[in-house]
Amino acid sequence: MPDAFQFAVWHLAARAAAWLRPPALMRGRETGPAAPSGISVVIPSRQGRQLLAPQLPGVLRDLPEDAEIIVVDNGSSDGTAAWLAAEWPMVQVELSADPLSFAAAVNRGITRARFSHVCLLNNDMLIEPGFFTALRRAFDRIPVLFCATAQIRFPAGVRREETGKAVMAQAHRDDFPIRCDEPIAGEDLTWVLYGSGGCSLYDAALLRVLGGMDEAYAPAYVEDLDVGYRAWQHGWPSVYVAGAVVEHRHRATTSRYFRELELAEILEVNYLRFLARAVADRRLFRKLWTDAIDRLRRRRDGALRNAAAIAIEGGAREHGHYPEERFLALTGGDVAVFPGTDESAPPLVEFAERLDTPPQTKLARHSEVVLVRSGNELARDAAIEWTGGKQPVGDKRAGGTPSREIRLPRES
């Protein structure tokens, strides 16, 4: 274990390096020709035959007619490719003899995908019926939606470490800066910072505009946060979909190749990499960076040794038009969305002391009720903006000016 002096040196170097981070880049990419409507399921798998066997039947049953499954079999010696060819001939196999990082594996699948939407699905996820329908429906409700992400449950008796409702918030300053909040009964289509790369549906064209997953995040973790954040910078949101449910056998692959302490350090290093590579606003970057390295020093976390080099090698790759502090307020754990029962009525955005299921009488008078924790005016303003942009259920308009008719009752 390094001594206190060594941690102090690493910390000082990291603080100085934050001022040397390269400026954000402006990059344009072509989206390519329009893809046919449908879903391409991309499943990265390493030595995963035993995980795929119980997963694939549910996926095949639930997929719509216009769909395909691509398994990216990488670094396997368990006969996965031959088994798929014999037992699941409808499944396409993208083969790599060498093991790939998560980002590299899914990017191979994304490149091969031919439909309008791409579902990234870990091989340790078991989907429940209606999974694909619920995710796809979100894109009919929300214009320019980037990602719809599923509700994540864990097997009985296993502590729930993920929920799908990802926010940037800390209960304590030494907590990891990203957490998953417990969904509220009746909550659906709440904005989230990003969708889990293990159970989310993406707009394939927008995903390609962003260059897919950033392969700097090796071997795994935080690449999904990175791409979701970069999408928000362009005004392309992600939402939590309560009706799309998966059961997750947590770290069924990574735990075979890395110890828990190694995985924890990979997560911390890649979070630093995310700050350096994704956060474009320089003032916001320096604040989040300082918070992160101060936290690592207090925890005496070895990830701090990498911080200075990560900052200097960084430089945000996107510089979109949508203010970062605005979408961080919207996805900071202070907002919850509840579908109403009157589709013809206007939505409602209001402050609340507690985020809890609204009474049925209120839901019956609105197409949607959005609760914002009292006092967070930036989140309230962002919620008004985004709620006004949603389409009514069944309205498939591709353009036009969204309705902004939103009542704002005074806080009592």
Features from the language model and the residues they span:
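Non-catalytic, C-terminal membrane-associated alpha-helical segments of glycosyltransferases
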Residues: 1-17, 283-351, 358, 379, ...
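N-proximal low-complexity "stem/linker" segments adjacent to membrane-targeting elements
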Residues: 2-58
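Acidic/His-rich active-site region of diverse nucleotide-sugar glycosyltransferases
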Residues: 14, 105, 111, 125-126, ...
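Short, acidic, metal-binding catalytic loop of nucleotide-sugar glycosyltransferases
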Residues: 57-66
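A conserved acidic beta->alpha catalytic loop
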Residues: 58, 73-82, 98
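Glycine-rich, basic loop-to-helix element that forms the pyrophosphate-binding segment
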Residues: 96-113, 123
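Short aromatic/hydrophobic "clamp" motif used to bind/position activated sugar donors
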Residues: 118
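A short, conserved alpha-helix in the catalytic core of glycosyltransferases
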Residues: 193-211, 216-245
